[in-house]
Structure formats: C-alpha cells, structure tokens
UniProtKB/Swiss-Prot annotation:
The gene is murP. It catalyses: N-acetyl-beta-D-muramate(out) + N(pros)-phospho-L-histidyl-[protein] = N-acetyl-beta-D-muramate 6-phosphate(in) + L-histidyl-[protein]. Residues 145-157, 202-217, 282-301, 356-368, 415-440 are periplasmic. One of its GO terms (molecular function) is protein-phosphocysteine-N-acetylmuramate phosphotransferase system transporter activity. Residues 1-89 form the PTS EIIB type-1 domain. CDD domains: PTS_IIB_glc (cd00212). Its EC number is 2.7.1.192. It is an enzyme of class 2 (transferase). The active site is at 29 (phosphocysteine intermediate). This is PTS system N-acetylmuramic acid-specific EIIBC component.
Length: 474
C-alpha cells in the first residue's frame, strides 16, 4: 500500500461502517483508526478484506481498523477531512443515534473507561520511544566505551545531551498527563496541567532540590504529595468533573473569568486533603502487586500469555499507568519486556505456519508481509492477518509468549530483574538497547534477547505440534 492512505479506501470504509451519519467520533492510536459508531449493526465486518487493511476489531460502539504505525495517524486525519464534508443530520436522527450510543456505552463501560487511557497516553508514546531510544543508545555506548559519569570531553558531553531528553520527559511527565487527562474527561487541559504541577512542587522549606511551593502545610494539615501518576489521573478526573458542574450555573459573561478559578480552588483543596494520600496508597499497592508478579515466574508467564488477548480487545492501554508506577518504584519498567514476549511468541507461531504452508499459498504471502513488522514489535498485522483468523495458532502464540515470560521471570527470581528504561517504548528486536538493570545494560539486553529466543522457539514448537491441525494453511 502506498505511503498515503487512498481516498478510495477511506470512502469504502466509510460506506461499510454505515456512512458519515453513523460516525460519532474519529481518532487513532499508534496502529489503528478508531471510529466511534452510533449503531454497530450497520457495520460490515468484511472491512478486514479490503486491500491495505490489516485487521478490524469491532466493539459495541467502536470500529478499530488496523493500518499500522504512521498510517493510522494519516488515515484518521484524512477520515476527519472526509467527515467534515458530510451533510448535517436532522435533530430526530441525532436524538435517535444518541440514544443508541448511550445504550452502547452502558454495555461496554470497562472498554469505555480503558479507552480513556488511549486518549491520554497515545499522544505521548512517540516521545517515550524517542527519549528511551536516545537514553538506551547513550547508555550502551557509555558501557562499551567505559565512559564514567564524571568524564569530560566531547563524547561524554554528547552522551549527556542524548540523556537529557529522558530526564526532561520524566521530570515533567505528570504535567503532560494532567493536561491530556483533563481533556479526555471533558475538562480544560491547562487546568489539569496546573493541578498536576502541585504534585511536582516541594513542600519542605529546608530541601535543597526541587521547587518550593511557598508553604509546608495546608491550613495546619501536613501535605504529602505522593501518588504521582495515579494521583494525577484522579485529580485530573476530579478537575474535569468539577469544571463541568461549575460551568452549568456560571453566567456566560463570567465563564472565562471565574470557571477555571473556582475549579482550581476546589480541586486543589481536594488534592491536598484527599487525592494525594489516596493516590499514594493506590500507587504503593499497584507497585507492590506488579513488582511481586514480576518476581514470580508463573505470574510473568500468565501476564505474557494473556497480553495478546488484551491487544485484541483493545484494553492493553490500561497497562500504561502501571508502567509509570513501576518506573517510579523500580527505576525501570519491568513489566514491559514481559508483555513483549507475547509478540515474540506470535512470530514463532507465524514461522511455523509458514513452514507448514504450501510454497505458493496465500498464507505464506501473508506471513511474509507481516513477519518483519512482527520482529520489530508491531504485532497487529500478524494477529489479524495470520494467527487470530485461524484461532489455534493464536492460542499457541499465546503459549509461546508465556514461555518467554516464564524465562524472564525465572531470571528475575534468580537475582537479575531487568526492564525498559522508559515508561513505554518499542517491543521486538528494536527494544534491545532500551533494556536496563541494576547490573548494567548488557546483562539486561542478554536476558531480553534470551526471552525473545525462548518465545520464538516455543511459539514455533507449540504451533507445529498443536496449532496446525484442522487449520486452513492455504
């Protein structure tokens, strides 16, 4: 398919989802065009057969069309332009569609909630990947070249320059999250950013680092700015809800002057008194749970084995707050490489299908087109084009991923926990230089590479033995 998404393809998709009048919203994540629909019964599931479409996920109120990285953003932009030219519906049609949309929302509340995480974090993912890659490459060069932290010269300066982006991102990440979260929950982004900044300020007048807020208690009550990303998400949600309530009774002439002012005062009070302590407890509980799962080999196997299923249902974005919590508590994201084993297991399954298929079959052509993205960590083409339509290979791919997760869990259990140097990043082979551990980058890279190899081989063996029986290999 060409680099640009053809208007003919988008018009065909638009027709098969029920036309412009059936579209409630248009957006994208890293690999998918996401179309909110009023009536899912009007959607033709054969969209997945269109040339250039790598897969389709249907929910009660959304159609997710898999295009791949980069293409999804261009598709969403072009689709928005097409929808902007669509005729306006009359009030009766809009009312009827809103009723159907409300009903759909009531039947998929969990998916609707998790979809918010995609809205909040997807715009940040390119930055996570770029900063993480720069940090990983700089760390690898420093390790190989034996560059110490206090070294002087052109090379150390260049390496420090490459690392500064990661420091900047994670120092002020909560402000970006607060802005996006407030918007996602229906509020004003800058209000969420201001509230998030309260979690960054220091409240100890004797501290020598950070930014002192100017007071150390809240009307005599101690301030404990814990919770980080969890607290910020709760505070941003509260900020958006309060803003909506204030705006209901605020006269239009005073809206710009007073709505945000009142919203910030109320939300900040709640943040200092309730949200910061609550966020801290939730943050500690979540970190404890996943740190113990990560150090439990069986827990790692279960997480890796189920992750492909989470991707299929579109709820994998719900892990991002966990990634951020682990970054704060461990200094690296130990969950991400475990979940990445799911994609590696699928690569092994696809190679087994390729080996068992006829030389000139369509299956071999499908695998050839999807295997390189799979090796580089983009799994949707393999999921929706190769394994999931045949079901058994999808199950054996999950088992292969579980084997890779078990391997990483065993190594962590034996004393070498490792993880991604960023909250989010690429998976597959591209993620190798982003691995880190207390023992250094090279041992972490070796563990990750070993996990990928185990997942490849296990996925291949499981699929060869159990995933090809009574399966269409044409």
């Amino acid at each position: 398919m060409a680099k640009e998404i053809s208007s003919e393809l988008l018009n065909t998709i638009l027709t098969r989802v029920g036309g412009p009048g059936n579209i409630a919203s248009c957006g994208n994540c890293m690999t998918r065009l996401r179309l909110g629909v009023h009536d899912s019964s009007l959607v033709d599931p054969d969209i997945k057969t269109l040339e250039g479409v790598k897969g389709v996920i249907l929910t009660s109120d959304q159609v997710q069309v898999v295009f791949g990285p980069g293409k999804a953003h261009r598709a969403a932009k072009a689709m928005s332009e097409l929808l902007g030219e669509a005729p306006v519906q009359d009030a009766a049609e809009i009312a009827a569609q809103n009723k159907r949309q409300l009903k759909a929302r009531q039947t998929s509340g969990v998916q609707q909630f998790l979809a918010k995480f995609a809205t909040i974090f997807t715009p940040l993912i390119p930055g996570f990947i770029a900063a993480g890659l720069l940090l990983g490459i700089a760390t690898l060069i420093a390790t190989v070249m034996h560059v110490t932290a206090d070294a002087q010269g052109t090379l150390p300066d260049a390496l420090n320059f490459m690392k500064v982006f990661s420091k900047g991102l994670f120092t002020f990440l909560v402000i970006l999250v607060g802005y996006n979260a407030a918007q996602a929950f229906g509020g004003t982004g800058v209000n969420g950013a201001i509230i998030a900044a309260l979690f960054l300020l220091g409240y100890n007048p004797t501290a020598t680092t950070g930014y002192y807020a100017g007071f150390h208690d809240f009307f005599g009550l101690p301030i404990d700015p814990r919770g980080n990303i969890i607290g910020v998400l709760i505070a941003a949600w509260a900020c958006a809800r309060i803003e909506c309530m204030v705006r209901r009774f605020m006269p239009d002439d005073l809206d710009m002057l007073l709505t945000s002012l009142i919203t910030l005062l109320i939300t900040a009070t709640l943040a200092y008194l309730i949200i910061m302590p609550l966020g801290g407890w939730l943050f500690e509980g979540m970190s404890w749970l996943f740190m113990h799962l990560n150090s439990n080999p069986l827990g790692c196997a279960v997480l890796a084995g189920l992750f492909l299923i989470a991707v299929v249902f579109g709820v994998h974005q719900g892990f991002i707050p966990v990634y951020l919590a682990l970054m704060d508590s461990q200094g690296f994201n130990s969950l991400f490489p475990i979940l990445s084993m799911a994609g590696a297991g699928q690569v092994g399954a696809a190679l087994a299908l390729y080996w068992r298929a006829q030389p000139h079959s369509a299956l071999r052509s499908q695998v050839r087109g999807a295997i390189i993205p799979g090796l580089l960590g983009v799994g949707e083409p393999l999921i929706y084009g190769v394994t999931l339509p045949r079901m058994k290979p999808f199950v054996t791919a999950c088992l292969g991923g579980a084997a890779g997760g078990l391997f990483i869990g065993l190594i962590a259990w034996w004393g070498l926990p490792m993880g991604l140097n960023s909250a989010f990043g690429p998976s597959g082979l591209v993620a190798l230089p982003l691995m880190t551990s207390a023992q250094g980058i090279l041992p972490a890279m070796a563990v990750y590479a070993g996990g990928i190899l185990v997942a490849w081989v296990s996925g291949f063996i499981f699929t060869t033995l159990f995933g090809c029986r009574n399966v269409n290999l044409d």
